[in-house]
């Protein structure tokens, strides 16, 4: 399995908080999720850490929701154009640009308190959730949700950040 090239933009100084190597921690989760969904080709993406004002502006402008949110994903390939990436992935030099994540650490922190999950688990949930969206997973329909949340649950469990039992199929709710 080839890796993921992640470029970062950190408008809020998140990556330098504490003594954790956040980039390494994030990469471990991303690679586990990549393996779980069977993506062998090289990928690239960006992760942008933003404040609540920027998160709200993006959410309002692109999703018509006038509130800050934990993560917003902009997938390059949404699976709706009929393009078969398989013909490209056989090329050893092909790197799939999967898109961009905009993450708001202060909203993630607030969610961790609201849901009683702790920051690490909530952050892990959010990064894996966003990554799956960039890889054309969604949770609009019940069968899609079951698949997506099942993958999230497995990755987080293996990493030591388990979900609540009912989150494996239903999402975040307790």
UniProtKB/Swiss-Prot annotation:
Domain of life: Bacteria
Positions in coiled-coil regions: none
Single biological process term from Gene Ontology: rRNA processing
Cofactor list: Zn(2+)
GO cellular component: cytoplasm
Entry's localization field: Cytoplasm
Gene Ontology molecular function: any one: metalloendopeptidase activity
Cofactor note (record): Binds 1 zinc ion.
E.C. designation(s): 3.1.-.-
Chain positions recorded as Zn(2+) binding sites: 129, 133, 139
Keyword terms, alphabetized: Cytoplasm, Endonuclease, Hydrolase, Metal-binding, Nuclease, Ribosome biogenesis, rRNA processing, Zinc
Annotated function: Single strand-specific metallo-endoribonuclease involved in late-stage 70S ribosome quality control and in maturation of the 3' terminus of the 16S rRNA.
NCBIfam families tied to this protein: rRNA maturation RNase YbeY (TIGR00043)
Protein family per UniProt: Belongs to the endoribonuclease YbeY family.
Protein name: Endoribonuclease YbeY
Species for this entry: Lactobacillus delbrueckii subsp. bulgaricus (strain ATCC BAA-365 / Lb-18)
């Amino acid at each position: 399995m080839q890796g993921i090239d992640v470029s970062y933009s950190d408008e809020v100084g998140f990556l330098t908080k504490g003594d954790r190597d956040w980039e390494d921690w994030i990469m471990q989760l991303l690679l586990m999720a990549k393996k779980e969904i069977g993506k062998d080709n090289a990928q690239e993406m960006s992760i942008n850490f933003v404040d609540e004002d920027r998160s709200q502006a993006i959410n309002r402008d692109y999703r018509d929701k006038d509130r800050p949110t934990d993560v917003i994903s902009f997938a390059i390939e949404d699976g709706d154009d009929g393009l078969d990436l398989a013909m490209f992935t056989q090329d050893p030099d092909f790197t799939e640009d999967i898109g961009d994540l905009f993450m708001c650490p202060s909203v993630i922190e607030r969610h961790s308190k609201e849901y009683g999950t702790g920051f690490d688990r909530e952050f892990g949930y959010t990064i894996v959730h966003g990554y799956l969206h960039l890889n054309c997973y969604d949770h609009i329909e019940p069968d899609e949700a079951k698949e997506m949340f099942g993958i999230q649950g497995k990755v987080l469990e293996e990493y030591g950040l388990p979900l609540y039992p009912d989150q494996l199929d239903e999402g975040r709710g307790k």
